[in-house]
């Protein structure tokens, strides 16, 4: 039971990271009706920006961990948000009214551009980082010596996810931008007729999704202690799977799907072969979609004619 509890903690932490990335996928799909296949690479860019910012701050002699974290979060969110804005302007906006495959192909092309750009700029090797947040708490020690531990970095990941979810929920439900986003989700043409700046709203959707992906990249960097140019592809596919599993277009579903994928991966790695953890996650997705085509929290679309 102690081993199970430890894996439950690990799975929830990993799922929190997937959930933050998945929100970006579901936001864009909910408002634009398209999948941003470059979003995983935006997550990777956020991780690299966090790493570079951290190294620059350390080189100046700054040692206060809270100050370093705050600066890294703000810088990585700001720069990565700019990447999100650029992707929308370059890869999506010119093709928004083209045939449906055009924006998808453009996004895939942008994904390759970002991946290879990062490989050239940062190299193909994994970039490690020394532990920034250490220590933790012992929750329980069994008679056979197994210890249930909750590390400080796990606490930071979970608290950061909860805070960002609360802020984002407030933004969507209580602000003018959130109202515009919900209006565009319902009907872009009608929203434009009612005075909503549709182009600006869609751009802000990409910006917010990229900022959340930047935080996820930072959490990944702190949790695993490394980044590499290929991590965006793997994490992006899993986060997209999480968004579909939870119900693409549903924000709570994106987080629920992220937690589900994180738990499936962690428990499979703990009790079975780690080599097949991805197979297990995608198999669960297939089973869920067979019986629930819209995902766990997705709503069926009804088109009136």
Q: Language-model segments: which ranges?
A:
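Membrane-interfacial amphipathic/re-entrant helices at transmembrane-helix boundaries
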Residues: 1-22, 49, 61-72, 98-102, ...
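Short, non-helical or kinked segments that cap or interrupt transmembrane helices
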Residues: 25-48, 97-102, 177-180, 198, ...
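Inter-helical junctions in multi-pass inner-membrane proteins, predominant
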Residues: 2-17, 124, 171-176, 202-242, ...
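Helix-loop-helix "hairpin" substructures at the membrane interface of multi-pass membrane proteins
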Residues: 14, 146-228, 251-256
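Transmembrane helix-bundle core of multi-pass membrane transporters
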Residues: 95, 103-174, 201-204, 267-272, ...
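Alpha-helical transmembrane segments within multi-pass membrane transporters and channels
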Residues: 60-110, 117, 256-261, 292
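Membrane-embedded helix boundary and interhelical linker motif in transport proteins
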Residues: 31-86, 90, 147, 247
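Pore- or pathway-lining transmembrane helices of multi-pass membrane proteins that form conduits
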Residues: 41-45, 94-119, 232-244, 260, ...
